Amino acid sequence: MSYEKKAVHFGGGNIGRGFVAEFLHNSGYEVVFVDVMDSIIESLQKTKTYTVTEIGDDGERKFTIDHYRAINSKHEMDKVVQEIASADVVTCAVGPNILKFVAEPVAKAIEARTLDYPIAVIACENAINATTTWRGFIESKLSEETKKNIDSKARFANSAIDRIVPQQPPNGGLDVVIEKFHEWCVEQKPFENGGKKPDVKGIHYVDDLEPYIERKLFTVNTSHATAAYYGHQNKVQYIHEVLHDKKLHDTVRDAVKETAHLIVTKHGVETAEQDAYVEEIIKRISNPVLKDNVERVGRAPLRKLSRKERFIGPAAQLAERGEKVDALLGAVEQAYRFQNVEGDEESVELAKILKENSAEEVVTKVNGIEKGQPLFDRLVAIVKKVQGGS
């Protein structure tokens, strides 16, 4: 395979190496990894190949990833800008909170770009409209002239990604173990009228991304996190063990029954189709082969409890429609109890916020719900319960 196309990817972590780079590599792209972690960049620079192992019920398959380079943006920002300026695609998998920190090099590269077609900019994050968010940070650093002609320089497309990367084996190095199932949906409208749609095997281009994003976030992420937080409270180690407990299994299913009702009524998805999707997701996260650690899945509770995320996002919309949200709020309570977990800074910060603020302040600060909104009083009651230790 010839590797004449080039993609720059921010984030040398497991999703970057094991999902995004795998797809790009298998579609003939040379991948340039960008990260600030010395250890990851040094490993990528010293190692010419790494292996992605896809696991599933029917066994495993392995891919060798090569034709990549790596740059440390902490030390060689000018080089990063040059690479992006001459790339076909720039992607990221850094976490939604880091998008603002990877905006400046993209902005500088867009200013410097001389190719006669626009670069494709695609954020691969577990967040709604992450590329739009990234674009806002990028455009804040562009000249007015470039902003006026942005379509000739860059096209920004939101995406929805779905693939579970479980806890990795110790001493695995750069190799990544990942589930076989994958979904990467990208909106295609931004590439109309002169854009260059990335030719990546496995990307599903769609006209309207919102149903795909919400279906994924409010089913996969909601069920996964619900299992994690209930599992943590019940001192269960792995997600599949949570799902093999009938009571906990039913609790997780109840949460995604509520979100399924939203997906069906809001987006016009057939009930049978959404039910089948829910079944597929429950089956996936119940897979013992993944050995998915409860604390890994539960980490970053502040983000997961925020306004547009997997619990409050669907619960707020359902509450505004006068629909049932009991199971989702049960999961919210368990998420609030995910405090002071070793290795997770947000769980420590959550404990601090709960200690230093009133319940009303916590709900506004953490959940983004204001007094007078349908969920407010019920969330306040949950926080008071957690603060009271009951």
UniProtKB/Swiss-Prot annotation:
GO CC term (a single one): cytosol
GO molecular function term, any single one: mannitol-1-phosphate 5-dehydrogenase activity
EC number: 1.1.1.17
UniProt keyword NAD, yes or no: yes
Catalytic function, reaction form: D-mannitol 1-phosphate + NAD(+) = beta-D-fructose 6-phosphate + NADH + H(+)
Binding site for NAD(+): A7, V8, H9, F10, G11, G12, G13, N14, I15, G16, R17, G18
A biological process term (GO) from this entry: mannitol catabolic process
UniProt keyword terms in alphabetical order: NAD, Oxidoreductase
A Pfam family: Mannitol_dh
Catalytic class of the enzyme: oxidoreductase
Active-site residues from the entry: K216
InterPro entries: 6-PGluconate_DH-like_C_sf (IPR008927), 6PGD_dom2 (IPR013328), Mannitol_1_phos_5_DH (IPR023028), Mannitol_DH (IPR000669), Mannitol_DH_C (IPR013118), Mannitol_DH_N (IPR013131), NAD(P)-bd_dom_sf (IPR036291)
Secretion signal, residue range per the UniProt entry: none
Domain of life according to the entry: Eukaryota
Subunit structure: Monomer.
NCBIfam families found in the cross-reference section: PRK02318.2-5
Membership in a protein family: Belongs to the mannitol dehydrogenase family.
PANTHER family the UniProt entry points to: ALTRONATE OXIDOREDUCTASE-RELATED (PTHR30524:SF0), MANNITOL-1-PHOSPHATE 5-DEHYDROGENASE (PTHR30524)
Function text: Catalyzes the NAD(H)-dependent interconversion of D-fructose 6-phosphate and D-mannitol 1-phosphate in the mannitol metabolic pathway. Has a strong preference for NADH over NADPH.
Name of the protein in question: Mannitol-1-phosphate 5-dehydrogenase
